[in-house]
Amino acid sequence: GGPGAVFWMWLMAIVGAASAFIESTLAQIWKVRGKEGEFRGGPAYYIEKALGHRWLGILFAVLLILCYAFGFNGLQAYNACSALEYYVPDYNENGLAMIAGLLLVLMTATVIFGGQKRISVITSIVVPVMALAYIAIALWTTISNIAWLPAAFAVLFESAFDFESIFGGFAGSVIMLGIKRGLYSNEAGMGSAPNAAATASVSHPVKQGLVQSLSVYIDTILICTCSAIMVLIFYVQDPAVAVGLNGMPLVQMAVNNSVGVAGIHFITFAIFAFAYSSLIGNYFYAESNFRFIFPESKRGLFAFRIACLVAILYGAVNSFDLAWNLADIFMGFMAIVNLIAILLLGKWALLALDDYSEQKSKGLDPVFLASSIPGLPKTDCWHEEHLKDFGSGPMKEYLEESVDMDFAGLK
């Protein structure tokens, strides 16, 4: 999208934090328990349970599966493999992309056939470590080239407000590209992140809504800006070379410009780690929605997993533009369905926020009960018999369990 798209990504993040709060709070309110005790939820679930339209929930689930299992996962596979271009410029022609794609498929298969808990362990270790290291590299690159920073920001803002470019063809303008890339980076409003938010065990839905809002700032304002600043510094230093690069090779050369060859190796590993963890997370989103449509189909789930692995291999060896175009199309349809749902249901998230704020003002650790909001459509969780699920050990539950014990237990 060019340098100016970064500015519109920032604005998208600020607006998106609000929609991320609403959709993730709704996902928590209408989450359900799986057979193994895990929580599942997301737009498909709150559309069915709160709006009463299962057909619309199924439509959303199908769109999410197409977007994440086949659009975004193809893009992530491409990103991971394109990092090889620095080492082998013709990697796609000589079969190396196919080998790398098969390796990705094998690594992903070991996780998706191993269950959700293994997903959590891998992503919770890999992502924070690599994110912190990535930020450190970006800070070093920025500080070591501080004299070029004003020129980099000048290019960014000049491009962002190039009105001839903006209004010359709005659908392909810097604003639209910034919005689409911002939506891709933080998912806010699309209805994908709520699938992850619903799995959390918290004492109040609003707690997870606030966490999801924060995540929007972390990934778009912090992580993506790190990439942008490194690339823009490289661009103003050597525009002829920068213009000829795309995707991961552009980021690799931007780091090489400041850190040296070691920086390229780090970026290669970091991008592979980010892309791999994203493949796993995206698959989990898709599987949660597949289970919504076909809750009891074990054979169907096996076939679905195989199809997802084929999509990863396909993305690894196909073009950059195709991956982005598929992702953009499905992403737009997902957002339309989900935004309509959160406009209709947003009042319940705001009432939950009022309940949370009231408890916080009294110095309490907020605990949510569905009965605290009059008229709230039926929920599977958040009733008194589920207090033990909340994880905060409310006094009422403790006393009820203690009355049958001896005095020491009650004390």
Kindly give the residue locations of the regions a language model identified.
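Helix-loop-helix module between adjacent transmembrane segments
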Residues: 12-37, 43-44, 48-78, 82-111, ...
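Extracellular loop-to-transmembrane helix junctions
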Residues: 1-37, 219-226, 264, 332-339
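Flexible loop linkers connecting adjacent transmembrane helices
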Residues: 1-5, 20-51, 237-258, 288-293, ...
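Extracellular/periplasmic helix-exit of transmembrane alpha-helices
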Residues: 21-31, 137-155, 163, 167-169, ...
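Membrane-interface loop-to-helix entry segments
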Residues: 78-84, 95-145, 149-157, 290, ...
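Transmembrane helix-loop junctions in multi-pass membrane proteins
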Residues: 3, 71-81, 108-120, 140-152, ...
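Membrane-interface alpha-helices at helix entry/exit sites of multi-pass transporters
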Residues: 3-10, 45-49, 53-61, 92-96, ...
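Terminal cytosolic tails of multi-pass membrane transporters
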Residues: 339-411
